[in-house]
Each structure stands twice: as C-alpha cells, then as structure tokens.
Amino acid sequence: MAAPSSLASSSHLSRRATAAASPSIPPPSPPPPPQRLRCGWVGRAAPPTRRAPGVCSVVSPSKPGVAAVDVPAATIPDAAATGVGVAERISVSSLLEVVADDLLKLNNNLKSLVGAENPVLVSAAEQIFGAGGKRLRPALVFLVSRATAELAGLLELTTEHQRLAEIIEMIHTASLIHDDVIDDSGMRRGKETIHQLYGTRVAVLAGDFMFAQSSWFLANLENIEVIKLISQVIKDFASGEIKQASTLFDCDITLDDYLLKSYYKTASLIAASTRSAAIFSGVSTAICEQMYEYGRNLGLSFQVVDDILDFTQSAEQLGKPAGSDLAKGNLTAPVIFALQDEPQLREIIDSEFSETNSLATAIELVHRSGGIKRAHELAREKGEIAIQSLQCLPRSEFRSTLENMVKYNLERID
C-alpha cells in the first residue's frame, strides 16, 4: 500500500464531495435472510461453505490520504437516512452488542498472546489491556467480517478473522505505549502510563515486543496481501510521528498536511484492518476496496473529533490536560482553521506560549474563530463518505452497527 502523496484541500468542505466521473453505488439485490453468526470458529481443515458472492458497482480508491472516493452530493445520506444528527444517543455497550461474544473471546486471548516469558512485559500488558479501552478497532474487524461473511455466504467466521482482531489490538496497544513515551504523557484512560510505572526503557521495549509479537502472528496468517497491508501500518505509525515532530509550532501547516499525518497515525490501521477482514471473508476486490474506504474515512473522522475534544472537554473527561496538543505545538484541525481568521493566534503560537496565560488566550481564539465548528463539519463529511462506502453490503445488523459507529463518533462532540 503506497503512502498517500496528496490530500483534498480545505475547499473540499464547501462542495460536500462533488462527483467525479464515477457512478453512484447502486443498492445490492436483496440477500437471502441472514443467519445470526456467533463464535463458531473453523480452521484450515474445515473450509467455509459459500453461496455465490454478491456484486456491487464501486469507485476504486486512488490515494489513501483523504478523499479517494468522490461521492456525488445527491448520494450522500442525510441525517434521517444515516442516523447522524438524530437525538437518541448511542452507548458503547449497545453499539458493540452484536459482536459482544467475539470481543469477550478476544479479551480472554489477549494477555496469553503476549506470552509469560518476561514478568515485566506481562505486567505491562495487564496494565494496558486492562485500562478500560473500548476495543473499537477489533470490534470493527468483527463487524466487517460478519457483514461481508453474510454477503459472501460464509456460514461461520474463521480463525483468521479472530486472529486478525487480536493482532490489530496488539498493534494499537504497542502504538499507544510508544505515543505516551514520545508525548511524555502521564495518564492513559485515567491510569498511569507504562513509562510512568516502569520507566522509559521498559516502555519502549514493551512496545517493541508487542509490535514484534503481532508481526509473528501476522506472518502465521499466511496471506501475503494482509501481511503487506498491516506491515505498512507499522511503517505509517513512524511516518506519522516524524511528520508531527517536524511540524510542531508550524503555523504554515496545511489541512492536507494534517490529514496526511492523521491518516498515518490513526486511519491507516483502521483502513487496513477493515479491508483485511473483508479479504478473509473472500469477497470481491471491489468490496474489499470499499471496506478500506470505510475504515479510512471513519479513522479520519475519529481523529478530527479527538482533536476537537482537546478544546471542548475537561481534563477529567479527557484523562489528560485540556489543550495539551496545542500546548506541545501539535496544530490540529480546529487550530488550522482558526489560523485563517485570527492573526493574533499565529503570533502566540510562534512565541511557543512564552508569555503568561498565552495558552488560554490561544484556546479562546480557537473557540471564537469558528475553528471548532469547521472541524466538526470536516468530521461529519468524512463520516458521511464512510457510510456511503457501506452501500455495497446487504442490510443487516452488522452494517447498521457500522453506520452507527459514525453516529457514535460524531455524538462525542455534542
């Protein structure tokens, strides 16, 4: 998977993803009544039973950075159709109920996958795996696996689907450990970080170990396409950190730069995992590409929302100091939009907050400028494109939950 080289500019917000020459995605033919799939794992010795795979017309992705799928404005679902903007809020527990059994099995397996050779690593794994994470990334693997399994006529999920979800969570966990070291973060999900408890050396080694262990399990999946996809993600993590470090306090950073960094650090893993889940279901390449587009745009939307929350939530809600990204010089979407209208904000950031209360003034300018509102529009736009990518799937509780994942993300701002 080649790293993206260019992204849609901020003017993309004003035109709501206008159409390229590509056709809109037609709805699939009504599928046979789906069977409720639960944890009946089958191995290589028991090949899955299939019906004839479904077919849908799709737009192939071009570059993974921003808008590889140009969707005609008329085909983007409105709030009534998608649930985005509807008053009823979604809880995490209700959102993930349809894959609760899958996640329970995953939770039971995670600690054993780390191994018991080193007590310090085991203790670090227990700390991070038990820190109250939502397991959204493996949940997305299970949701796409089950949605595409219904489309392909796969009667049961495979051990590859299960192991993929475990690998994705291990990679995500390793990246969090390293992120906390790089950012010198003292808290993660309301608990002390690994490097605070065990020191930087152990934290770095623990993250390295999890990357290595996940790579070993990945190789044992024996699917070269998936191995390439997930291996690229680990490279993207490093690229994202380097890009972020090279643009600290840089008021000339563009929205394209920000979205590329966000792809590397967040969306790459989600996009690769949703595409890999579809690959293991055995659906067509076109559908696998749409699952990639879903994951990529959902990942970008999630990152933009996270960056908005850094300005709108308290330290208690965030589990870290509010405005911490800005304080460290990491300029995110709300700041990039605000810089277009607030010259004083540039002066304050250029000074690296050297004067008393300058950070508080900068945060106030971001709020006053409308930067948060424009960032919200960006997050919503990416979410709508993600939902559009699901139209080649048959209607099911799993597709509905994938759509509701977009709604849940946007509700975090309200």
From Swiss-Prot:
Q: Where is the transit peptide?
A: 1-72
Which reaction is the catalytic activity of this chain? 7 isopentenyl diphosphate + (2E)-geranyl diphosphate = all-trans-nonaprenyl diphosphate + 7 diphosphate
One BP annotation, GO: isoprenoid biosynthetic process
What EC number is given for this enzyme? Answer: 2.5.1.84
Q: Where is the composition biased (Low complexity)?
A: 1-23
Is Cytoplasm given among the entry's keywords?
A: no
Positions binding Mg(2+) 1 in this chain are: D179, D183
By sequence similarity, the record places it as follows: Belongs to the FPP/GGPP synthase family.
- Family matches, as PANTHER family: GERANYLGERANYL PYROPHOSPHATE SYNTHASE, SOLANESYL-DIPHOSPHATE SYNTHASE 3, CHLOROPLASTIC-RELATED
Q: Its biological function?
A: Involved in providing solanesyl diphosphate for plastoquinone-9 (PQ-9) formation.
Name this protein carries in UniProt: Probable solanesyl-diphosphate synthase 3, chloroplastic
